[in-house]
């Protein structure tokens, strides 16, 4: 079928389908009215078993890569002109959530050896193996009817006894304190990301523990660094975690401050984290945080939010969390005690080996980078 004809047909039927390619996950994301679900299922089936291979377009792309190999890419130009983008890219490199920029370019030999048939064969082998494949269907529909339609299409996939296996090297965070700056034009202020990375065992309880740790740190950033000491502007902490395959996480404490305050901020951050390692948090504070988790979950996941359900369920899969644990979310959350959190702070955080990336016109005295 001509591509434009298919596109027009899908538009009329309100069907959309796109590929989702991430560092360690591949799949499809599709949406359609319930009445057109069989057509969506058949479209996915055809895509994985009989994809259209456009050799002419593939060759054009290859030649374009060869011609522009030694030229600066648009992304590289954007990075050089935007220190904050450089900083974000460096965070991804140092925490294992992205590839090093130096590894992203293919050599001329690698480009010449690219083969569309080999690429298609890899994806066909990946997508047509039911072992290790998970389908997530969310929406307002009759489950029995939809499952019959689903099975009538995907039940045709031959059974395989072989699970697709891929090996991933264990990601190692910097083994010592790493401090690196990027230039900006502000004479008096430093914008910084103070990163605390580590490895964890995937599972809902450990994920909730990390989220509680994040919010406990946030409370102290606001009360100590901003309200009591007035050292930072708009302090914020985020948590990134990736359960499968690496089991990695990092806390990112982000704020801006006057240049002269940076040494004091670093010392106070260490004191805050040291206190959380040594003392159990107050039950009242912990229970307040737990209630906020339950309220947020109730508000986000309801009968009118299929996309939120899809995001939540796919997140469980990617982070090694089970549906049964999620069914007992409240009990799992309630089981986390102040003593467990104190132990988690001790186990997960090394306050001496951290990553500090910053934007400043002035280089910090303790900068450990080579530039």
Label for each model-derived stretch:
Residues 2-50, 61-110, 130-138, 187-205, ...:
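M16 family metallopeptidases and their MPP-like homologs
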Residues 53, 142-144, 155-162:
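Bacterial peptidoglycan biogenesis and beta-lactam-recognition machinery
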Residues 116-153, 353:
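Non-catalytic, conformational "gating/processing" segments within enzyme and secreted inhibitor domains
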Residues 121-125, 175-183, 344-347:
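Short, surface-exposed beta-strand/loop micro-motifs that present aromatic residues
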Residues 162-220:
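His/Glu-based metal-binding/catalytic segments typifying zinc-dependent metallopeptidases
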Residues 223:
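Long, His/Glu/Asp-enriched segments that create or flank divalent metal/ion-associated functional microenvironments
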């Amino acid at each position: 079928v001509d591509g434009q004809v298919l596109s027009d047909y899908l538009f009329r039927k309100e069907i959309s389908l796109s590929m989702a390619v991430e560092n360690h996950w591949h799949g499809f994301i599709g949406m359609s009215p319930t009445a057109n679900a069989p057509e969506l299922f058949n479209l996915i089936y055809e895509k994985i078993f009989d994809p259209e291979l456009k050799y002419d377009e593939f060759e054009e792309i290859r030649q374009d890569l060869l011609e522009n190999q030694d030229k600066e890419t648009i992304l590289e130009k954007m990075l050089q002109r935007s220190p904050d983008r450089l900083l974000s890219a460096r965070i991804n490199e140092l925490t294992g959530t992205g590839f090093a920029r130096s590894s992203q370019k293919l050599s001329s030999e690698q480009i010449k050896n690219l083969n569309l048939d080999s690429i298609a064969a890899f994806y066909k082998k990946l997508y047509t193996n039911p072992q290790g494949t998970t389908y997530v269907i969310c929406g307002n529909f009759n489950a029995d009817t939809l499952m019959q339609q689903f099975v009538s299409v995907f039940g045709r996939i031959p059974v395989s006894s072989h699970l697709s296996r891929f090996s991933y090297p264990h990601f190692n965070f910097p083994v010592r304190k790493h401090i690196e700056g990027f230039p900006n034009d502000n004479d008096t202020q430093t914008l910084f990301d103070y990163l605390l990375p580590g490895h964890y065992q995937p599972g809902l309880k450990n994920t909730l523990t990390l989220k509680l740790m994040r919010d406990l740190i946030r409370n102290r950033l606001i009360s100590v660094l901003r309200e009591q000491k007035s050292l930072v502007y708009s302090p914020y902490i985020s948590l990134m975690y990736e359960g499968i395959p690496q089991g990695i996480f990092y806390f990112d404490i982000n704020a801006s401050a006057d240049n002269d305050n940076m040494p004091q901020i670093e010392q106070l951050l260490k004191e805050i984290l040291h206190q959380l390692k040594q003392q159990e948090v107050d039950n009242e504070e912990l229970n307040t945080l737990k209630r906020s988790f339950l309220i947020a979950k109730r508000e986000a996941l309801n009968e009118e939010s299929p996309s939120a359900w899809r995001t939540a369920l796919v997140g469980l899969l990617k982070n090694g969390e089970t549906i049964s644990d999620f069914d007992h979310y409240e009990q799992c959350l309630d089981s986390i005690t102040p003593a467990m959190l104190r132990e988690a702070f001790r186990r997960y955080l090394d306050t001496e080996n951290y990553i500090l990336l910053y934007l400043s016109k002035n280089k910090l005295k303790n900068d450990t980078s080579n530039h």
